[in-house]
Amino acid sequence: NITYIKQDEPRGIAHAIMLCKEFVNNEKFLVFLGDNIIQKSIKNFVENFKNSDYDATVLLCKVDNPSSFGIADIKDGKITKITEKPKEPISNLAVTGIYLLDPVIFEIIDNLKPSWRNELEITDALDNLLRKNNNISYEKITDYWKDTGTPQDILHANGEIISKHPDFVRRHGSNKVIIGKNCK
């Protein structure tokens, strides 16, 4: 069974998570944003979290443009700070939008103030959780990860995947598929 819980207006990822509070029923849970594309399974990350005492595990990935993402600062193997789209990034480790969370996050979200975007930011919730009890771990995605939040990102990801796995593409008809400027 699949259960959909609708967020009627964009009020932030933390707000969307809060809408799921009753559904989660006081169990650890996974948040996987729908615009993520990854190459490998996250099963091991999930199992590690389920068997841990952590309040959260955040999946991170190195990026070339850190000011476009939530960024985690790591010192001595621990997350020390999480910042949403920093103007001056403290690292190049992006928060991927894949979160393993304990229900303690709901108490943190309850006390969040809206950001400058008038949203309840998951990065603020995680940073507050970090300051409260410093019980957040992280895992790094070292293979393929792509945030496809824009149409250009979707096209770019399609091109990358097709070029690496041409055998996955089924061809129908006689025309070639072209991805590029001014295509129709």
Where do the language-model regions lie?
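Short glycine-enriched loop/turn motifs at secondary-structure junctions
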Residues: 4, 90-93, 139-141
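Residues that form or immediately flank small-molecule/cofactor binding pockets and catalytic motifs
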Residues: 7-9, 61, 84-87, 143
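Short gly/pro-enriched beta-turn/loop segments at secondary-structure junctions
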Residues: 52-54, 66-67, 93-94, 172, ...
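Conserved beta-strand segments of alpha/beta enzyme cores
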Residues: 3, 78, 135-137
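Left-handed beta-helix
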Residues: 103-104, 110-184
